[in-house]
Amino acid sequence: ASGQLHRPQPQEHTSTSAAAGTWRLTQASESRHRLPHCSAAPSHQDHSAMGFGPELWCPKGHTELLRLQDSELRLLELMKKWMSQRAKSDREYAGMLHHMFSQLEKQEGLGHLRATDHSSQIGESWWVLASQTETLSQTLRRHAEELAAGPLAKLSILIRDKQQLRKVFSEQWQQLSQEYAWTTQQEVEKLKAQYRSLVRDSTQAKRKYQEASKDKEREKAKEKYVRSLSKLYALHNQYVLAVQAAALHHHHHYQRALPTLHESLYSLQQEMVLVLKEILGEYCSITSLVQEDVLAIHQKVAHAVEMIDPATEYSSFVQCHRYDSEVPPAVTFDESLLEEAENLEPGELQLNELTIESVQHSLTSIEEELLASRKAVSSKEQRVWELQVELRGEELALSPGERVHLLGKRQGLREAQQQLQGLVCAQAKLQAQRDMLANKLAELGSEEPPPALPLQEDRQSARSTDQERSGVTALKTIKNHISGIFSPRFSLPPPVPLIPEVQKPLCQQAWYHGAIPRSEVQELLKYSGDFLVRESQGKQEYVLSVLWDGQPRHFIIQAADNLYRLEDDGLPTIPLLIDHLLQSQRPITRKSGIVLTRAVLKDKWVLNHEDVLLGERIGRGNFGEVFSGRLRADNTPVAVKSCRETLPPELKAKFLQEARILKQCNHPNIVRLIGVCTQKQPIYIVMELVQGGDFLSFLRSKGPRLKMKKLIKMMENAAAGMEYLESKHCIHRDLAARNCLVTEKNTLKISDFGMSRQEEDGVYASTGGMKQIPVKWTAPEALNYGWYSSESDVWSFGILLWEAFSLGAVPYANLSNQQTREAIEQGVRLEPPEQCPEDVYRLMQRCWEYDPHRRPSFGAVHQDLIAIRKRHR
């Protein structure tokens, strides 16, 4: 507890967790945990042909497959522990028998054991009994050695390969899902959004061109119109190619990639079942004795091993998890994009004088990529063939009971086949895009590309332009009328009355966001014309923020003589001013030309200051004071964090960072966000009130009276909360006892997310200084390079464990921050606290591995703590 240090010595690590599991789902468990089937399959299905097919392609099925493998791994660990104990018992028993014979030999001498004056049946019987006991001890010792060198060693290999299989399967499934989502959803949606924007720009440019009266203005408008069409056509082609690629990726994903992945997993799982059967058979053979009573037990064990059939091992699992999951529809061209566009056909490339060059360049580029893709496919096919030949040759030379040594090679073959499927998919997409481009150019032949559009000649009269526009309008009207006949009619709710909404005060307007940071405004405004009203954090003024031409613009609403204005005449209230700008569609200012189109509404977390009744001050944070309080609506007890009004805007934005993280969290071991008050100063973050206070004070005051099992349970709570954050790619960066809260029932909750960050790849690179970093809780890679990740949080969790079992002592108490960093770099770690269980301290040491990749995940830490708690009765 004094925070002294020691250098870790090399030691043999042994597994600290072993839990019973089962591979085969019993009928009773099916009745308790029956899940919906993926499809209506016949009940008398041929189980031998069943695999991890379409029933398990959905995320639920993937989760169940991972859970199945985890269950099997737990069972294998249990078997390994069992066999190890059996070998140890046999060695000890053989040693005891040998000791008995040695003692007898010392007392009587080997000659006296048999030599008698006459032939004595008793002496001969005694010699046989004693000598056969020694023979039995040698046999048992040999059996123990064979058990350790045979089944036990092979079981370790099987566990290692099964862990690797689970890891590879999970990674490949995630990779396939991410690639599928990127190709069929994200990229297509991004192009669709750009498509709509360019269609609007093109329509606007066309209108200006048609309305231009002077020659100079008309020529200028014409150039702008042509440029907009050029961009639109180029993007149209890009979108067509993306849709083609997405459709092919969809087909390949559900017809090739997923079936190959699941067939590979199913095959390897079956192979591992067969390997385990051989291992158990060898175990049964080695441990078999000849006594009748033992033989009866052995026959039962042998029968149980014989019942293992790899072909039907997973039949009950597949039957139990047949989810109702349909393959999503293939990606097709969104014809709604063409409602306002001209001369464009769905799914057809646009080849004209504006796009001929880009189409030719695209064809050249894709042909180069296709050539490289073909080489990669050919190389991978050769590698798959070589692995198959090697595997067949080794199978022929394989001795009975040695299949386990081929598991790694089988898994390598399956991985290569899966990689081949990915390369084939990429080649198919490139080939389809290349064919589409080549066919389009072949249709053109040696002719000149057609003009991009029939531009009106400058000499045409305005009257003819009006006639053409009216003709187009009439044609669109006819189209809309015809499509309306066949499209379903939807009943729409009546429009919301505008007058009562306008008369509401500013704080009740859905588009008023209060004192939110300027940086957050940029995230909320997504499309041109989006707007909101906020309160300036520095000057106590109201600001109208609008997105225009891809940039957020901010206009201070001027207040004078009880009127609010931006440029023209004022109105009595800001809601009336905003409503006037929306209804009239007049520019905000003549210079900017900005027009409001869509209000951005505040989210569900926004509370008014009047909704919260403040109580007494219960603490102080980095940004301001913390109060107890109640919600006026239902008297819910809450904790209210306030932000000092004098702080600069960048610190106020950091204050709200905690709320942005907590909005996405919903877990019993994470403190719950209730809302945010940003309508005026000071800003509040409203959270659930955790009555027990911070964990550090709890340890120092109540820790000595706390039972060991309860303390482990509280650490289990912390690990569960951090495991949830890890799944959300959230990095806490300040995990310590002082930042955890304890409920009245001694449940621990993770709190204080002021330094937290959320990154898609789970890694955050800090570029700030070291002033506020808690050095003694922070991982070395974060201190040295600013690299924060869930692995660095695991290091901090190890310090939290040490704090808990030292009952609130200060880590590295006798060292400064700099001395602590130097000691850690030299391999020095904290000594185990008094009364700390050995398996808990081993877990701490694993958390303090210098290499982040060697530290356990929070999921593993959580499971280890559960196992440790179960062992401490």
Curated annotation (Swiss-Prot):
**UniProt domain F-BAR: residue ranges:** 50-313
Asked if the keyword Plastid belongs to this entry, the reply reads no
Q: Where is the active site?
A: D734 (proton acceptor)
**Highest taxon in the source lineage:** Viruses
> Per the record's keyword annotation, is Membrane included, yes or no?
no
List residues of the Protein kinase domain.
612-865
Give the modified residues of type Phosphotyrosine: Y764
Family as reported in the entry's similarity comment: Belongs to the protein kinase superfamily. Tyr protein kinase family. Fes/fps subfamily.
UniProt miscellaneous comment: This protein is synthesized as a Gag-Fps polyprotein.
Name of protein:
Tyrosine-protein kinase transforming protein Fps
Q: From which organism does this entry originate?
A: Fujinami sarcoma virus (FSV)
Its taxonomic placement starts with: Viruses, Riboviria, Pararnavirae, Artverviricota, Revtraviricetes
